[in-house]
Regions:
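Catalytic Walker B motif of ABC-type/P-loop ATPase nucleotide-binding domains
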Residues: 172-176
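ABC ATPase nucleotide-binding domains
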Residues: 245-273
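Conserved ABC ATPase "signature" region
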Residues: 125-143
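Helix-to-loop junction immediately C-terminal to a conserved catalytic motif
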Residues: 61
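The feature captures the beta-strand-to-loop junction immediately N-terminal to the Walker
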Residues: 46-48
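Conserved ABC ATPase signature
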Residues: 147-151, 155
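Conserved ABC transporter NBD signature motif
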Residues: 69-77, 86
Length: 273
């Protein structure tokens, strides 16, 4: 099958965030956040609920124009990218996408091809081939004509990813991409994204709550707490008993896995009765 048309990613730094600050509804969400992501790298942002992870991804995707500091994608400040150019550069899978009522799966996935459709034009045969390719890769071909509203949560999650992959952008932002998936489809989705990294140099910036899964796929992890970066490095340096205990207020034991550290919750000991 024909793979989705992909914009060629320059080498070097894909994402450069400098001194980013975000205030929403009068509340300071992010303060002085700086990070960089190399082209072809997989960086996963972790942190407790309310830390600002999703807000960071929205800012990187250009969805928070009122933020302070700067965000550049492949060397270009995001504020200078026209909407169509931005859509060809970065694809986003948000936690709760807005889905038009009654829209079928194939039509939704084809929305990812919008940046390549000329004004007043229609999707080409190549666009349809790209959409069917990702549907096939995500085991969704049989759902192409189904309304999205009739699918389970996990099936919809895969459709949301399919739309983003059909976009063919060199940068993929994933906000909790496996939250509604069973373990089999989690592995299927993440292995597909990782294969696209290997084959096409795709750059991935994700947020994830499952720390063990995050540690197996990420090249680097960024721990955010109270709106600030408190740790940045390889999974083995960030997923430690001390850091997780401090910022998650959780009892855990970190053990070595085949592809990265695994985080195991530890129950509190109760005094003998």
């Amino acid at each position: 099958m024909t793979a989705p048309t992909r914009t060629t990613a320059p080498t070097g730094v894909a994402v450069e965030v400098t001194d980013l600050g975000v205030t929403l509804g009068g509340a300071r969400i992010l303060t002085g956040v700086s990070l960089s992501v190399r082209t072809g790298e997989w960086v996963t942002v972790i942190g407790p609920n309310g830390a600002g992870k999703s807000t960071l991804l929205r800012a990187v995707g250009g969805l928070l124009p009122g933020s302070t500091g700067s965000v550049s994608l492949f060397g270009t400040p995001i504020a200078r990218l026209r909407r169509r150019d931005r859509a060809r550069t970065v694809a986003t899978v948000p936690q709760s996408p807005v889905v038009p009522a009654g829209m079928a799966v194939l039509d939704y996935v084809l929305l990812g091809r919008t940046p390549y459709v000329p004004p007043l034009g229609r999707e080409s045969a190549a666009d349809l081939a790209a959409a069917y390719d990702v549907l096939d890769r995500l085991d969704l071909t049989g759902f192409a004509a189904r309304p999205l509203a009739t699918l389970s949560g996990g099936e919809r999650q895969r459709v949301f990813l399919a739309r983003a992959l059909a976009q063919g952008a060199p940068l993929l932002l994933l906000d909790e991409p496996t939250s509604a998936l069973d373990i089999g489809h989690q592995q299927e989705v993440l292995e597909l994204v990782d294969q696209l990294r290997a084959d096409h140099g795709l750059t991935v910036l994700a947020t994830m709550h499952d720390l063990s899964v995050a540690g197996e796929y990420a090249d680097r992890m960024v721990l955010v707490a109270a709106g600030a970066v408190v740790a940045d490095g390889p999974p083995r340096e960030v997923l430690t008993d001390e850091l997780l205990g401090t910022h998650y207020r959780a009892r855990v034991r970190v053990i070595e896995g085949e592809h990265g550290p695994l985080v195991v919750p530890v129950r509190a000991r109760r005094p003998a009765s």
